């Protein structure tokens, strides 16, 4: 075993970090120690995960995650349509002036209100049930589903809880949901179009947003399976 790889694996941080990566977590610069470990041993750990037919990716924004291939020995996970939509809105908020005004902190209610404002409410209600009529009960169910999506995205490292009052900050890892932007385009406007049009997101060197961890060539974009092992 190469000396530097041995150093990385023997680091006391590595077992927990490895478990988080395998569970689909994104490691951003806010996670100082784990991010530093991945940065210091990126080459060695990339070779390590290749043995599992999995790629250790460092995104242009600086965060790390694992991308399993179709033959990977590491399980793949899929996000629901609502999870992806919430992720796109989080990315929009990350780019917004409101993030600076709020010192980077948002509430579950603010995210929900932004989601309602930016998308077709009828389409959102169909994510609750096809028979949804837009009643107060339907809206309450939708809010609970949005909270569930936020919990999933928190486990993936997209948001960071602030206290116990339903507040959170947004990680740069939400750029996994970012729109492709042509030179000269406004990135926030591009993200807004993406949300309103309900488009799939495909980056030149990134996987499709239909699956944060799936092989892009085999992913079914209509699959609505929830993340394995999460309530």
From Swiss-Prot:
UniProt-annotated location(s): Cytoplasm, Nucleoid
A Pfam family of this chain: MukE
Compositional bias (Acidic residues): 214-231
UniProt keyword Cell cycle, yes or no: yes
UniProt entry tagged with the keyword tRNA processing: no
Domain of life: Bacteria
GO cellular component term of the entry, any: nucleoid
Keywords from the UniProt entry: Cell cycle, Cell division, Chromosome partition, Cytoplasm, DNA condensation
BP GO terms, sorted: cell division; chromosome condensation; chromosome segregation; DNA replication
Renumbered residue ranges of the record's region Disordered: 211-231
NCBIfam families linked: PRK05256.1
Function, in words: Involved in chromosome condensation, segregation and cell cycle progression. May participate in facilitating chromosome segregation by condensation DNA from both sides of a centrally located replisome during cell division. Probably acts via its interaction with MukB and MukF.
Subunit structure of this chain's protein: Interacts, and probably forms a ternary complex, with MukF and MukB. The complex formation is stimulated by calcium or magnesium.
Family: Belongs to the MukE family.
Protein name: Chromosome partition protein MukE
Protein species of origin: Vibrio vulnificus (strain YJ016)
């Amino acid at each position: 075993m190469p000396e530097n790889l041995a150093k990385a694996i023997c680091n006391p941080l590595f077992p927990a970090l490895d478990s988080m990566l395998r569970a689909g977590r994104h490691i951003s610069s806010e996670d100082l120690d784990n991010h530093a470990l991945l940065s210091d041993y990126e080459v060695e750990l990339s070779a390590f995960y290749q043995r599992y037919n999995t790629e250790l990716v460092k995104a242009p924004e600086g965060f790390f995650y694992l991308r399993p291939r179709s033959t990977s020995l590491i399980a793949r996970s899929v996000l629901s349509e609502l999870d992806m939509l919430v992720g796109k809105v989080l990315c929009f908020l990350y780019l917004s002036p409101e993030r600076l005004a709020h010192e980077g902190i948002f509430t579950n209610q603010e995210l929900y209100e932004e989601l309602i404002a930016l998308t077709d409410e009828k389409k959102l209600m169909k994510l609750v049930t096809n028979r949804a009529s837009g009643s107060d009960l339907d809206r309450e169910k939708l809010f609970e589903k949005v909270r569930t999506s936020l919990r999933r995205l928190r486990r993936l490292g997209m948001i960071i809880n602030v206290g116990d009052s339903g507040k959170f900050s947004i990680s740069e890892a939400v750029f996994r949901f970012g729109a492709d932007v042509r030179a000269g385009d406004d990135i926030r406007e591009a993200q807004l179009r993406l949300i309103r049009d309900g488009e799939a997101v495909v980056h030149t060197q990134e996987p499709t947003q239909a699956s944060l961890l799936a092989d892009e060539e085999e992913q079914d974009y209509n699959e609505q399976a929830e993340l394995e092992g999460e309530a």
